Design a protein with these regions (language model features):
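Nucleotide-sugar-dependent
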Residues: 164, 217-222, 227-248, 259-267
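A short, well-ordered alpha-helix in the C-terminal region of glycosyltransferases
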Residues: 285, 292, 299-314, 323-326
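Carbohydrate-associated surface elements
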Residues: 116, 136
Length: 331
């Protein structure tokens, strides 16, 4: 797979790894790194959070040619509580973690997705340059919503690992119904078979619809059609060192959002202004957020519009892209 994306020349040689041709993978990687190197310009290799041991030699080769090496870190330890990985995956992440930490020591800088991740890196690698770079998203809103559906629809979209706090949302939804409010819950996404057992909490509830995995097009349509969007998380190291990509995606719809206050979420959005902010693992607060939106639909819609403005300010493709380029130019 190769071609041009905008002004970017790209090639994908990962198929060589999938075919077990690791030496050919190294050979091809070195050829293109040498071909693309321009001694009259700044040359940068941007690497993903985890450094796989088979990629380490190629990154070292790029460094020896004169490339600046920068990492894009979006998480901390992938084996932290709540990730529910298999033994095989845990061993793999343990090994890549060791390789990654070794690689970070001689890198030129890193993009990090949260303040906590920045502080963690600065303690471990003091000379390294850091840039907090949130994820970006396109604007999804097409027309400004004027009113809620009847009955209003709540959406959860994402994975179903313990870290995602789906259990608290389901219990909150049941509590809202118990208090006499009429609403529906739609869920999309997927998790490990053991994670999906959480749906047993609502297996006999006619107002809950689990759609499973959906296409990108259907996901956007569902995000726009639903009235209240939710982003839940547990209070875990994984949650507080990473950043929930679903937040910006939800804000981009212009619909009201209930968001768990983990990581840097509270630095971007304000409670009752651009989202309804709840503490992690708190059923009562999630229920109160749903009830507030149900009882105050016009206020909810305004909060959704304010959230869209936050997305445009902090998570737009243009804004995040400029921050990305500026850091690389000045590294």
């Amino acid at each position: 797979l190769k071609g041009m994306y905008g002004d970017c020349d790209y090639i994908d040689i990962s198929y060589l790894l999938n075919e077990g041709k690791i030496f050919q993978y190294y050979h091809q990687g070195k050829i293109f790194l040498k071909k693309w190197f321009n001694s009259d310009k700044k040359n940068v290799v941007v690497c993903y959070t985890k450094v796989e041991f088979w990629d380490y030699p190629i990154i070292r080769y790029a460094y020896s040619l004169g490339y600046k090496i920068v990492y894009d870190q979006v998480e901390t330890d992938y084996n932290t509580k709540g990730t529910n990985n298999s033994i095989k995956t845990k061993i793999h992440f343990l090994l890549t973690g060791k390789v990654s930490r070794r690689a970070y020591k001689w890198s030129d800088g890193s993009f990090v997705i949260s303040e906590a991740l920045k502080e963690q890196n600065l303690k471990a690698y003091p000379p390294q340059k850091m840039c907090i770079l949130p994820n970006s998203t396109p604007i999804l809103e097409k027309t400004k919503k004027q009113f809620f559906s009847n009955p209003p629809t709540i959406l959860y979209s994402g994975t179903f690992a313990k870290k995602d706090g789906v259990e608290y949302l389901l219990k909150a939804f049941l509590l809202v119904q118990k208090k006499g409010y009429s609403c529906r819950l739609i869920m999309t996404g997927k998790g490990q078979p053991s994670d999906m057992k959480v749906l047993e909490l609502v297996k006999d509830n006619p107002d809950v619809q689990y759609k499973g995995m959906v296409s990108d097009r259907e996901l956007v349509e569902t995000l726009l059609d639903c009235d209240i969007l939710t982003m839940t998380r547990e209070n875990s190291k994984f949650s507080n060192y990473g950043f929930p990509f679903k937040l910006s995606e939800s804000l981009a719809t212009g619909n009201p959002v209930i968001a768990t206050n983990v990581s840097d979420v509270g630095k971007y959005v304000k409670h009752m202004e651009s989202v309804y902010l709840v503490q992690p693992e708190c059923v009562e607060e999630i229920a109160n957020g749903i009830i507030y939106y149900l009882e105050n639909p016009q206020n909810a819609l305004q909060i959704g519009q304010n959230g869209l403005n936050v997305m445009k300010k902090h998570f737009s493709i243009e804004g995040v892209g400029k921050k990305f380029i500026d850091f690389l130019v000045n590294i």
